[in-house]
Curated annotation (Swiss-Prot):
Chain's gene name: FMNL2
Family annotation (SMART domains): Drf_FH3, Drf_GBD, FH2
Domain GBD/FH3: 23-469
Molecular-function GO term, any one: actin filament binding
UniProt name for this protein: Formin-like protein 2
Organism: Bos taurus
Subunit structure as annotated in this protein's UniProt entry: Interacts with TCP11L2; this interaction promotes muscle-derived satellite cell (MDSC) migration and differentiation.
Lineage: Eukaryota, Metazoa, Chordata, Craniata, Vertebrata
Length: 1095
């Protein structure tokens, strides 16, 4: 640790020249125990401690050995005693000179100990016994006293210098007064009170001044500031420093030191404190003290003087400019901010920054630019305020115009939707008529085909008959047969025997020719002909067969080919040459060929679904890389018949796409209560203010309130109900009155009171009204009818747009060819990704569209939906605006079709009830007019409801979903979400392309500059660095970065590190014509550190 060495040089040399041997590693249990102790002593943040716990045993043992080797050798009181010895005014000059030679080394070792030792050592140094902070602040005040005194003596006489020697004593008073520290941050009373007394009630001596001059020539002030910085890096120490009455003042007074490095360190520490809420007030108070002590005419005068004069030390100038930037612009109060800005303006900051605008220091340029970017231009702000008022008036006017236009747009949309629905209904009707015409055409076409076939067969039969007649005449000429005409016009064919006589026997009839058949008996009637056998169309004409026995058996009939009509049986063979002359029956036609395979397949392998439609089996797709799984919900092959997926071909899409690029992007990485009659009788006997009430108290009270709202008498109300007069009784009153329809028990109580002939005057107004109200015939029906009539128009106006939106959305989704193409692309890419693991599918559930955003590319920068959007834009530009074909989908998504259909049924029941009432009172013109005017409207609404239901069922089935389990509130939002996500993906793709293009242009521009200039020239290097800084500033202006420093050990170091990296250059509430204000660096205030963050 930092306090490893002893104070004397011998021990220091011994440790420097003796390296201890490495001890053997203990058992793992003991190792872990000792390692836990070391970690606890180091007081590390949780993330760093977690990192050390991940070390292996060898590294853990090395860390333990290092920690035990550099153990704390000097307790805190050792350093405190030495510092107190330097502050002893009674010590001689010679002895002080000998002691102070090692003061800087003591302070350095103290700083290292404060920075590296465990928190317990620091707490011991700061406790009530040691009061290390008081001693350290007192020594800092002593070390820089001479600098302040010498500076004042330049501008004043010797007498005034003695009088002005009070600041050192004032600055270190009360350090030993009480042991309790004052209350923390913002306690200005303790700071102002220090001017009332001197440390020793005496003026500093000449010896003290000379000793201080001796110390000021060393680095003691710088190392003291480092010690205070190390203390402030702990939560406990930070609170003590902020609570100390003089610590921050002495740090600020250290700006009088002649070392620029010390002044830069002071400004960095003060800037870090300034970024803590509440710290800004402390810093300003310290500079008020600085002004008084150093005799400044204006606050920050010496700071600006150092800033101007130390122009050869860039680090100090950067720290000064950074401090000015933070102390001015980290204030949220705009007026106070302008005040601080004007303080520096009076000190000449603006003119000096104008001179420094061409500085070659990039860090200084960044701080100057940050200050200028956050400067308030009050004149411009006033002009902006006036412009803002005019703009607000214009905005109000535009908002009013937008409101009117929105109303007109809504009316136009409703009108357009009604027209669209009418057109869609006509289209659906025409489609149905077209389907009927197609069926009729199909049947007529079949009949025509059959008739043509019959005509063709008849022509062929006539031709065969003519051929047979020719053959018969030829045989007759040859003398083989003889033709004999009968009386009935038939012709008998008689065969001729060898002796030339014609034997008697049976005859052969061929067509209209009849002849005896050889070998058949001549007597007896002919037997009936055999049943016809099916033959081909080339078979000979029908011949009646007799019982004759032919000399040669007939050939078997050919097999019947499907599906010709059955012709007559074939003729028997003729004897003699006739058997040889007649043509033989033709061969049967070949069997019909098998059905051809589906288009696009090389194999006849098919799958038959329940509709007997053949579906080709999809082969798995082999990919080069392992692809992520797209977790869609697939449809089974028997579920796609009649859906959109039966009409698309995803394999054809894959031929158009660059699947290699796709693989490269998405490859994987690794009502009231009943009234009791007995209780009602008891209420009759009770008297309250000479009135009897039969109704329940709350019910009577509510009825009285309702009747008072109407302002009508009971007679007027009952008469209006009887004639359905909605002009006298508004529908709202009717609906309220329906809650007070008399119950069965109330009617019994009222009738009992009436039968007992008790005076009605004793009843309350509500009971008398209920007496008349309950006597109205069919009261429930009449009240229901009145409410129905009163709400009918409103119900029609409410339900019609909902049904129209369902119809329009359903038809537009089903008829969208562009949407079908999008689904085709999704199916193709999904099968490409899943085929090797899950196999190809034929369709997917619509809920799978929501999963497109969950499937991300290998670099996690884009999703599958982003890729699909790119593919559509590059290869299928014509379908990129598919969402323009989907009409009123968002409105349809908000409709509960089931409830709408129930409301339509309720309207029908109300109309039926009204019709029945009208049949009983046909003289009522109000009911007659209502039925006449609105029955057609209800019929149209019912037709719309039927069309909406059918259209929705069709589109749901078309996409492979179940209408019973997929209501509109589930079906349509899928498309709403998909369209929204698709549009967003398009925008993000476009933005990404623009960014890539801008980056490419920037790189090309830089390359061109590099080619034009000498890369080694200083001006080229400076310009490139400035361009990089400006680009960094622009990026930070775009982002909303809030610098939040939480209360934890090391917070001060984090702030100072951020300051050195120029990470805090933007501040809140900056309004300018040119730029947009950036966000505030926010740091937890000191009180929150003490109250909550340190617990």
């Amino acid at each position: 640790m930092g306090n490893a060495g002893s104070m004397d040089s011998q021990q220091t040399d011994f440790r420097a020249h003796n390296v201890p041997l490495k001890l053997p590693m203990p058992e793992p249990g003991e190792l872990e125990e000792r390692f836990a102790i070391v970690l606890n002593a180091m007081n590390l943040p949780p993330d760093k401690a977690r990192l050390l716990r991940q070390y292996d045993n060898e590294k853990k043992w090395e860390l333990i050995c290092d920690q035990e080797r550099f153990q704390v050798k000097n307790p805190p009181h050792t350093y405190i005693q030495k510092l107190k010895g330097y502050l002893d005014p009674a010590v001689t000059r010679k002895k002080f000179r000998r002691r102070v030679q090692e003061s800087t080394q003591v302070l350095r070792e103290l700083e290292i100990s404060l920075r590296t030792n465990h928190i317990g050592w620091v707490r011991e140094f700061l406790n009530e016994e040691n009061k290390g902070l008081d001693v350290l602040v007192e020594y800092l005040s002593f070390a820089q006293y001479a600098v302040t005194f010498d500076f004042e003596s330049v501008e004043s006489t010797v007498e005034s210098s003695v009088d002005k020697s009070k600041p050192w004593s004032r600055s270190i008073e009360d350090l030993h007064r009480g042991s309790n520290l004052p209350s923390p941050v913002g306690n200005s009373v303790s700071r102002s009170g220090r001017h009332s007394a001197l440390r020793y009630n005496t003026l500093p001596s000449r010896r003290t001044l000379k000793n201080s001059r001796l110390v000021s020539k060393k680095d003691d002030v710088h190392v003291c500031i480092m010690c205070l910085r190390a203390i402030m890096n702990y939560q406990y120490g930070f609170n003590m420093v902020m609570s100390h009455p003089h610590a921050v003042n002495e740090i600020a007074l250290s700006l009088n030191n002649k070392n620029p490095r010390t002044k830069a360190l002071v400004l960095e520490l003060l800037a870090a404190v300034c970024l803590v809420r509440g710290g800004h007030e402390i810093i300003l108070s310290a500079f008020d003290n600085f002004k008084e002590v150093c005799g400044e005419k204006q606050r920050f005068e010496k700071l600006m003087e150092h800033f101007r004069n130390e122009d050869n030390n860039i680090d100090f100038m950067v720290a000064s400019m950074q401090f000015i930037n933070i102390v001015v612009h980290s204030v949220e109060d705009m007026n106070f901010r302008v005040h601080l800005q004007y303080e520096f303006t009076k000190l000449g900051l603006d003119e000096y920054l104008d001179k420094l605008k061409h500085t070659e220091s990039d860090k200084l340029q960044v701080q100057i630019q940050a200050y200028l970017d956050n400067v308030f231009d009050v004149g411009a702000l006033l002009e902006d305020a006036e412009t803002k008022n005019a703009a607000l008036e214009r905005v109000e006017e535009l908002e009013e115009n937008i409101s009117h236009l929105s109303e007109k747009l809504q009316d136009t949309e409703n009108e357009a939707m009604s027209k669209i629905v009418e057109l869609e209904k006509q289209l659906m009707q025409r489609n149905k008529e077209l389907d009927v015409v197609r069926e009729i055409y199909k049947d007529a076409n079949t009949q025509v085909h059959t008739l043509r076939k019959m005509v063709k067969e008849k022509e062929e039969a006539i031709q065969r008959q003519s051929t047979l007649e020719k053959k018969i005449h030829e045989l007759e000429k040859q003398g083989t047969i003889k033709i004999q005409k009968k009386g009935d016009g038939d012709i008998a064919i008689l065969p001729v025997v060898a002796s030339g006589t014609l034997p008697t026997g049976s005859e052969v009839a061929v067509g209209n020719f009849v002849g005896p058949v050889m070998g058949a008996p001549s007597s007896g009637p002919l037997p009936p002909p055999p049943p016809p056998l099916p033959l081909s169309s080339d078979a000979p004409e029908a011949v009646q067969n007799g019982p004759a026995t032919p000399p040669v058996p007939p050939p078997p009939p050919p097999p019947p080919p499907p599906p010709p009509p059955p012709p007559p049986p074939p003729p028997p063979p003729l004897p003699g040459p006739a058997a040889e002359t007649l043509p033989a029956p033709p061969l049967p036609p070949p069997p019909p060929p098998s059905a051809p395979p589906l288009p696009g397949t090389s194999s006849p392998t098919v799958v038959f679904n329940s509709g007997l439609a053949a579906v080709k089996i999809k082969k798995p797709i082999k990919t080069k890389f392992r692809m992520p799984v797209f977790n869609w919900v697939a449809l089974k092959p028997n579920q796609i018949n009649g859906t959109v997926f039966n009409e698309i071909d995803d394999e054809r899409i894959l031929e158009d796409l660059n699947v290699d690029e796709f693989e490269e992007i998405f490859k994987t990485k690794a009502q009231g209560p009943a009234i009791d009659l007995s209780s009602s009788k008891q209420k009759i006997t009770q008297k309250g203010s000479n009135k009897v009430t039969l109704l329940e108290a709350n019910r009577a009270k509510n009825l009285a309130i309702t009747l008072r709202k109407a302002g009508k008498t009971a007679e007027e109300i009952c008469k209006a109900i009887h004639v359905f007069d909605l002009k006298t009784l508004p529908v709202d009153f009717v609906e309220c009155l329906m809650r007070f329809l008399p119950t069965e028990n109330e009617v019994k109580v009222l009738r009992l009171y009436e039968r007992e002939r008790k005076p009605l005057e004793n009843l309350s107004d509500e009971d008398r009204f209920m007496m008349q109200f309950s006597k109205i015939e069919r009261l429930m029906q009449k009240m229901t009818i009145m409410a129905f009539i009163g709400n009918f128009t409103e119900s029609i106006q409410m339900l019609t747009p909902q049904l129209h939106s369902i119809i329009a959305a359903s038809v537009s989704i089903k008829s969208s060819q562009k949407l079908k193409k999008i689904l085709e692309i999704i199916l193709a890419l999904g099968n490409y990704m899943n085929s090797s693991k899950r196999g190809a599918v034929y369709g997917f559930k619509l809920q799978s569209l929501d999963l497109l955003l969950d499937t991300k590319s290998t670099d996690r920068k884009q999703t599958l939906l982003h890729y699909i959007s790119n593919v559509v834009k590059e290869k299928y530009q014509q379908v990129s605006l598919f969402y323009n074909e989907l009409h009123y989908v968002e409105k349809a998504a908000a409709v509960s079709l089931e409830n709408v259909l129930l409301d339509v049924k309720e309207l029908q029941r109300g109309m039926d009830l009204t019709k029945r009432e009208y049949t009983m009172h046909d003289h009522n013109t109000l009911l007659k007019e209502f039925i006449f005017n609105n029955e057609g409207k209800l019929k149209k609404l019912q037709d719309d409801a039927k069309i909406a239901q059918d259209a929705f069922d069709d589109v749901v089935k078309y996409f492979g979903e179940n209408p019973k389990t997929t209501p509109p509130s589930v079906f349509f939002p899928v498309f709403v979400r998909f369209v929204k996500a698709y549009k967003q993906a398009e925008e993000e793709n476009e933005l990404r392309k623009k960014q890539e293009q801008a980056l490419m242009e920037k790189l090309l521009e830089q390359e061109a500059l590099l080619e034009q200039q000498d890369p080694k020239s200083p001006s080229h290097k400076s310009k490139r660095q400035q361009q990089e800084l400006i680009a960094e500033l622009r990026r930070r202006q775009v982002k909303d970065n809030r610098h939040v420093y939480e209360g934890k050990d090391g917070a001060i170091e984090d702030i100072i590190t951020a300051l050195k990296k120029n990470n805090i250059t933007k501040f809140p509430n900056v309004h300018s014509r040119v730029r947009i204000s950036s966000s505030t660096p926010v740091v937890e205030d000191t009180q929150s550190w003490q109250a909550s963050l340190f617990t």
